[in-house]
């Protein structure tokens, strides 16, 4: 049960926004007893917004880091291609599994740099969801990608041996759709090598940590799952990705 409100914020202006529930909604919440109410603010991509003050009738408790999954990936994980933030696979995943996700995706810059990996490893997280390869394939070969992924998995499994790591094989999903629809991909040969490296390293570290590789071929298969650029998922694609990840996480009790 959730309510959605939209507010327009002018650039360079300080705005005061009031969020208020209808009387019927308040009565419903009171009927639930002491169950907590979660307020989630979704900001537009590529926009900087600062909170100066939050005034509430009741005390607001911030979620602890260890209650959240950390999501790291490309613009796909940031929600590009979805109609709005609430339609992105990250948000759908939260709703499907009733979990909190801290989105650390970097549009065009998910390159697994050691400094970024070190930062992610320092976060006190419940688990990690990783969507890797889309950005890296454009600026490095599979050997360098494997080197960086090896460092990442080694660090996470060493520092967080009991922390689940879910890897979304998004390149496999894209290549599967291209193949079924006779689309020539400029990264076809490179994708095969990257996918092979991901599978190899998952197998290597699966004996040490709790790593779950989600097959891209089971996420989305039809062309309407992609947007017009044939790279970012469409709204339907985001829904399918969230559904595929949800099934795996439910199967292994990761939520």
What are these regions (language model features)?
Residues 173-215, 240:
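Substrate-gating cap/lid alpha-helix
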Residues 39-107, 114-124:
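Serine-esterase "nucleophile elbow" of acetyl-processing enzymes
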Residues 1-69, 246-255:
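N-terminal secretory targeting modules
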Residues 228-255:
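Histidine-centered active-site loop/cap adjacent to the catalytic His
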Residues 133-145, 182-191, 228-232, 236:
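The substrate-binding groove and active-site-proximal loops of carbohydrate-active enzymes
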Residues 89, 145-152, 194-201:
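A general structural detector for well-ordered alpha-helical segments in enzyme core domains, enriched
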Residues 93, 110-155, 170-178:
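Oxyanion-hole/transition-state-stabilizing segment in secreted/luminal serine hydrolases
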Residues 160-165:
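A short helix->loop->beta-strand "cap" motif at the edges of active sites that frequently abuts
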